[in-house]
Amino acid sequence: EMSAQYMLWQVYPEWMTFENYHLIDFMKGTHYAFLHAYNTYHSPYVFEYWSNKRGIDFFGDLCRSTKLGEDPVMTYKRITSQTQEQFNDEMFDASCKFITWDMPRIEQIAHKYANQHTTTLNAVGDDWYRITKDKSPQNYGYNGIKLKVPKAGTKIILHFKGIAGTDSFSTTNL
C-alpha cells in the first residue's frame, strides 16, 4: 500500500491535500517504525525522499531489486551499499525534511503543511523532559518537537538521553 500511495502521489502531486486524512493520520504516527502497519496507508514519504535523493527511476529500481525475504529497508541498504550507520543518518535527514516538506518535487504544494508536527513532553524534574511512552520512536520513527527560538546570541544547551533498560524504554530483538 505504501507503494500504491507513492505512485498515486507521483500522478497527483496535490495528494496531500485531496486525501489530507492520510497526512493527518501520518502526523499522529510519525513515531511508529517506518514499515509499521499503522503507516501502511498513509506514509509514502520515505519513498519520496529516496526518489528525491536518488532520482525518479529509483523507486522502480528498488522494487525490481528486492530479493526473497527482504523488506524495503534491507533492499535499499543493499543496493545503495549503505552501512547501518549511514542508513540511520539518512533516515534522520529524511525526518528533518518531513518537518518542513523540503523536497523539490513537492515543496510548492506541501509547504502549507510545514511545521505541523506535535509531540507531548512531560517534565520529569531537573529541567528534563520525556516523550510520552505511547509516542516513543520505534525503528526509524521520529518525533517533531517544536522549539521556542530564543533571541539571537542566546546560548542554549541540550542533552538527549535514551535510557535503555528502564520500564519506559521498549526493546525488540536485542
Where do the PLM segments sit?
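Acidic/His/Gly-enriched intrinsically disordered linker/tail segments
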Residues: 1-53, 57, 63-98
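Beta/coil-rich, acidic/histidine-enriched accessory regions frequently appended to metallopeptidases
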Residues: 68-174
